[in-house]
């Protein structure tokens, strides 16, 4: 029941998912009864496949992840993952503390056999259709070459079956396209990725550079978590930055008589449309790839729409047996 807008937006998202889907799955809503019960009373839930599970403790955004997971065993986060571990639930979704989600997922669910380190990716828009996934974006700051290879392999499985990308394309983020570029660990990763390509596990096109991410040269861009998280946070700042300078510039043109009000409104609408590809709420969240269960985390500011779409993502991963396919590939 985490997130900046919880629990109201979580309850709304759950209700929307059940109604929109025609009740094709059951949802266990986990949280503090005294806060959730009044919200549920606002909806007609009688015909919905919805059960409530009381969890008295809360892991906040300020909590130290590993410490909080151990100390707050009765939190919605830990209780939800334990339900998955016990096979009483098939997936867990939350917009709570990402670090705590990652720590709890690994602690409670463990790793898929053969996985060295679970990972997390991010969405980036690209020229043309579709999206680019950047992996890793903070789960693994210090990576070995073999970690980068597994990230590419796991995300290839996810894209192929869950995202319906027929032929995912893997690029290794580096300071140049040539094979011998970059530090030793990237040179080794290149060789190992090329071997995986030859074994037909992935479709590896070699090194790519930063400008290739938005250009759409690859559907999967592999890097360590430090680089990935830095790029992610920079990318998240772009719409806000451009919006902050665009609005005053537009107002100045109107004030100077160089642009009429109607044209300014149209320009503003066009500007908003440009950044529609940056809207990740259409996907809801991202799964932790490599943990032995389905654990999906959304942005802390997730809306009801994002919660609903995270639920659909979980359903799709279950149907496509993504984790089973990852385990089979790594066996």
Swiss-Prot record:
Identify the main location: cytoplasm
List each coiled-coil range: none
BP terms from Gene Ontology: fatty acid biosynthetic process; phospholipid biosynthetic process
Q: In which pathway does it act?
A: Lipid metabolism; phospholipid metabolism
The superkingdom of the source organism is Bacteria
Q: Which GO terms describe its cellular component?
A: cytoplasm
Task: Spell out the protein name for this chain.
Answer: Phosphate acyltransferase
* Originating species: Chlorobaculum tepidum (strain ATCC 49652 / DSM 12025 / NBRC 103806 / TLS) (Chlorobium tepidum)
Gene name linked to the record: plsX
């Amino acid at each position: 029941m985490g997130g900046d807008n919880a629990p109201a937006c979580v309850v709304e998202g759950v209700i929307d998912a059940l109604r929109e889907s025609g009740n094709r799955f059951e949802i266990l809503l986990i949280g503090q009864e005294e806060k959730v019960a009044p919200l549920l009373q606002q909806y007609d839930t009688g015909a919905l496949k919805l059960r409530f599970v009381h969890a008295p403790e809360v892991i906040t955004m300020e909590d130290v992840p590993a410490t909080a997971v151990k100390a707050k065993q009765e939190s919605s986060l830990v209780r939800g993952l334990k339900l998955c571990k016990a096979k009483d639930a098939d997936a867990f979704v939350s917009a709570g503390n990402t670090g705590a989600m990652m720590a709890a997922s690994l602690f409670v669910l463990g790793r898929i056999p053969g996985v060295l380190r679970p990972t997390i990716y991010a969405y980036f828009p690209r020229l043309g259709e579709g999206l680019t996934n950047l992996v890793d974006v903070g789960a693994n700051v210090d990576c070995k070459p073999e970690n980068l290879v597994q990230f590419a392999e796991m995300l290839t499985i996810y894209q192929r079956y869950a995202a319906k990308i027929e032929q995912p394309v893997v690029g290794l983020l580096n300071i140049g396209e040539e094979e011998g570029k970059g530090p030793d660990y990237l040179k080794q990763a290149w060789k190992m990725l090329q071997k995986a390509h030859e074994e037909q596990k992935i479709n590896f096109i070699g090194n790519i550079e930063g400008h290739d991410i938005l250009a759409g040269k690859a559907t999967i861009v592999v890097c360590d978590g430090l680089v990935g998280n830095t790029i992610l946070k920079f990318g998240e700042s772009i719409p806000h930055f451009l919006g902050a300078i665009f609005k005053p510039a537009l107002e100045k043109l109107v004030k100077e008589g160089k642009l009429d009000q109607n044209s300014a409104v149209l320009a503003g609408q066009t500007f908003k449309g440009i950044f529609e590809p940056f809207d990740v709420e259409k996907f809801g969240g991202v799964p932790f790839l490599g943990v032995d269960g389905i654990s999906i985390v959304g942005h802390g500011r997730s809306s009801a729409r994002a919660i609903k779409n995270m639920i659909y993502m979980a359903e799709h991963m279950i149907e496509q047996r993504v984790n089973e396919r990852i385990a089979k590939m790594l066996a």
